[in-house]
Amino acid sequence: MHRNDSQRLGKPGGAPESLQMANNNFLSTLSPEHCRPLAGECMNKLKCGAAEAEIMNLPERVGTFSAIPALGGISLPPGVIVMTALHSPAAASAAVTDSAFQIANLADCPQNNSSGAGGNPAKKKRKRCGVCVPCKRLINCGVCSSCRNRKTGHQICKFRKCEELKKKPGTSLEVRGDDSFFPCLASSLIPPFSPPFQCFLSPFKMHHSFSESPSRL
């Protein structure tokens, strides 16, 4: 009996060899090279199933989706909000609140800028005309208060101050009668006009005071 058993075990075509071949075939199908893709697919399926379950349970954890504003109006990317909602409902609600606050601030900014622009209009700086006698004067008198306080004051000489700048900003520019025709001549040197022409110039004529003449300097 012992000899027959040993012969059976030692035979090349016996049962032990067939079992060994079956085991080898089974192990070859489950080799690491074949197991890695199968394991990756299994893990992917498990992750997808877990993600679908979390998404299905998301309304119960966070609330209804109606409380979340449209994804186009949120400053944060939609994926960030969804991932935050999956991990922490409180953080998701805080992110949604923060996004709504940012949207409200952006909506208020143009209104504030427009109100500020309407309340403080830019003032237009007036310029010298360059035609009147004070504008043509090139030398300061050195006697008036503006010239005496040149180190502390910032006003121009009184004899060089433009006639247009002396007027109030609301008044319109008036047309000068005699000076418009003879800007370089004094009023005493202008010849008298005929009565009809004087009647025509009377509404536009301006009376300039030459009391402070350059001869006094």
Curated annotation (Swiss-Prot):
The keyword Metal-binding applies. Keywords: Cytoplasm, DNA-binding, Metal-binding, Wnt signaling pathway, Zinc, Zinc-finger. It is found in: Cytoplasm. Signal peptide: none annotated. A zinc finger (CXXC-type) spans 122-163. Zn(2+) 1 binds at residues 129, 132, 135, 162. Zn(2+) 2 binds at residues 141, 144, 147, 157. The CXXC zinc finger mediates binding to CpG-DNA. Its main location: cytoplasm. One of its GO terms (molecular function) is methyl-CpG binding. This is CXXC-type zinc finger protein 4. It comes from Xenopus laevis. The keyword Zinc-finger applies. One of its GO terms (cellular component) is nucleus. Pfam families: zf-CXXC (PF02008). InterPro entries: CXXC4/CXXC5 (IPR040388), Znf_CXXC (IPR002857). Residues 1-20 are annotated as: Disordered. Coiled coil: none annotated. GO terms for biological process: Wnt signaling pathway. Acts as a negative regulator of the Wnt signaling pathway required for anterior neural structure formation. Ectopic expression induces ventralization. Binds preferentially to DNA containing cytidine-phosphate-guanosine (CpG) dinucleotides over CpH (H=A, T, and C), hemimethylated-CpG and hemimethylated-hydroxymethyl-CpG. The gene is cxxc4. The lineage of its organism: Eukaryota, Metazoa, Chordata, Craniata, Vertebrata.
